């Protein structure tokens, strides 16, 4: 049975370890899509958080991105708190992808 893009996204996202983040673009590519914005929409409907850790997905610039369908406010504060609890350093809403990025090639 062929997996949907959403199923592929959720499956691949579970590979991102604690203390690392991936980007919408990297996640889209490894799931076989060019639609990184679509990945964001898929993650907004994540039925299995935190087992499927959508808080570990950020923008390609390292900016924190959205969370739970929001781009600011309490949800973003929660995302930052979750990442920091896992050892990811967030400076002014930005994460150093050189240090914390997981591009699925490791």
Language-model features, listed with the residues they occupy:
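Nucleic acid-binding interface residues in structured DNA/RNA-binding domains
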Residues: 1-106
């Amino acid at each position: 049975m062929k997996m949907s893009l959403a199923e592929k996204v959720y499956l691949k996202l579970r590979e991102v370890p604690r203390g690392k983040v991936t980007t919408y673009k990297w996640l889209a590519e490894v799931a076989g899509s060019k639609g990184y914005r679509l990945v964001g929409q898929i993650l907004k409907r994540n039925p299995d958080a935190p087992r499927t850790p959508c808080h570990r997905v950020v923008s390609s610039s390292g900016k924190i991105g959205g969370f739970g369908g929001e781009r600011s406010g309490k949800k973003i504060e929660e995302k930052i708190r979750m990442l920091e609890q896992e050892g990811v350093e967030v400076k002014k809403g930005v994460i150093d992808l050189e240090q914390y990025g997981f591009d699925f090639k490791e």
